[in-house]
Amino acid sequence: MRKINILLLLAIVALTYSCNETTNTTPDTLTDTANEQKSIITMLDSFNSAAAKADYKTYFNFYTEDAIFAGTDATERWDKKAFMVWAKPIFDKGSAWNFTALERHIYFDKSGTLAWFDELLNTQMKICRGSGVLVKQGNEWKVQQYILSTTVPNEILDSVIKIKSTIEDSIINNLIR
């Protein structure tokens, strides 16, 4: 009887450990994350380069079909199709916008198929912040959502608020009606 109890106890312990989900924290996982991060850095640099070259097709190929773009103006929130319509005349002039990353932070969800980032950009508007959500589709990372924000130094924020108040008060009033 005692041998049966010991065998039963060992079987329960073995079953318990075999059923536990483990997270792979081997160097391979770290390598995969580093490789995915490099892939995203390359993708974002190419994304910005396509806009600088006014390569309309390549630039918009970086977006998912149901992507959202939010620009620096409070009225600029477009799905991909609307953003393409808005941007087409700008790209047709032969130069769109030229953004260069100054600093970039990239994060991943546990599945490794969703990432989000924020970056400081050197632009014609001076320093802007880009942030977004990326999804992995096949072997490619695609922009699901991108938000472009201008930065305003705290020392001059009160002056900027005064300048934009009339325009944005009108937008606020339209939105709360």
PLM feature segments, named:
Residues 47, 59-60, 67, 83, ...:
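Hydrophobic pocket/interface hotspot
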Residues 68-78, 89-96:
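A short gly/proline-enriched turn/hairpin at secondary-structure junctions
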Residues 1-31:
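Bacterial Sec-dependent N-terminal signal peptides
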